[in-house]
């Protein structure tokens, strides 16, 4: 049985690394808004995402926060104002 987790990733990284982080996360998760991605992944994908982000960021200057939930249903998501990228839109 494949175990999945729902991730919410927010980041604040140096301007010289923003595009690398954003481009990488777009291959793995759904873009929500500036510096925020979310989506369901397997545990092995989760580990790969963490490893690849570690390779991109500068631990002395950058910040990446990863929230993990058992499922999307375990997370209450309430958007105030403009929703920049609704998750129900398929690209």
From Swiss-Prot:
Its EC number is 3.1.-.-. Coiled coil: none annotated. Its cofactor is Mg(2+). GO terms for biological process: defense response to virus; maintenance of CRISPR repeat elements. Pfam families: CRISPR_Cas2. Mg(2+) binds at residue 12. Keywords: Antiviral defense, Endonuclease, Hydrolase, Magnesium, Metal-binding, Nuclease. GO terms for molecular function: metal ion binding; RNA endonuclease activity. CRISPR (clustered regularly interspaced short palindromic repeat), is an adaptive immune system that provides protection against mobile genetic elements (viruses, transposable elements and conjugative plasmids). CRISPR clusters contain sequences complementary to antecedent mobile elements and target invading nucleic acids. CRISPR clusters are transcribed and processed into CRISPR RNA (crRNA). Involved in the integration of spacer DNA into the CRISPR cassette. Functions as a ssRNA-specific endoribonuclease. HAMAP family: Cas2 (MF_01471). Homodimer, forms a heterotetramer with a Cas1 homodimer. Belongs to the CRISPR-associated endoribonuclease Cas2 protein family. This is CRISPR-associated endoribonuclease Cas2. It comes from Methanothermobacter thermautotrophicus (strain ATCC 29096 / DSM 1053 / JCM 10044 / NBRC 100330 / Delta H) (Methanobacterium thermoautotrophicum).
């Amino acid at each position: 049985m494949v175990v999945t987790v729902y991730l919410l990733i927010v980041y604040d990284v140096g301007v010289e690394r923003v595009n690398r982080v954003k481009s990488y996360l777009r291959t793995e998760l759904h873009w929500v808004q500036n510096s925020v991605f979310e989506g369901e992944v397997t545990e092995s994908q989760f580990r790969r995402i963490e490893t690849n982000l570690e390779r991109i960021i500068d631990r002395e200057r950058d910040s990446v926060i990863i929230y993990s939930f058992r499922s999307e249903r375990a997370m209450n998501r309430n958007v105030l104002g403009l929703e920049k990228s609704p998750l129900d839109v398929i690209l």
